[in-house]
């Protein structure tokens, strides 16, 4: 009986680990933020980062998944 319970517990833990790993691999869609996971954009997209400034002071970096052939320029 103890062996059966232990085996069931091990299988549950392994299943949870596999589900979590699968969720981490999920790709980030177009125009969604990829600052913390720059390599997870869906196929055909790239993670493009920008340094944000407010009144001349750098306020951090933000990254977004955009098309690989898309380029943004300042106005």
Curated annotation (Swiss-Prot):
What do the Gene Ontology cellular component annotations say? Answer: extracellular region
- Protein name as annotated: U6-lycotoxin-Ls1h
MF terms in GO: toxin activity
Q: Which residues form the signal peptide?
A: 1-21
> What compartments host this protein?
Secreted
The entry's propeptide annotation covers: 22-25
Q: Which domain of life is it from?
A: Eukaryota
Q: Which Pfam families match?
A: Toxin_35
Name the keywords, alphabetized: Disulfide bond, Secreted, Signal, Toxin
Q: What modifications does the entry list under PTM / processing?
A: Contains 4 disulfide bonds.
Tell me which tissues or organs this protein is expressed in. Answer: Expressed by the venom gland.
Give the family, as the similarity comment puts it: Belongs to the neurotoxin 19 (CSTX) family. 06 (U6-Lctx) subfamily.
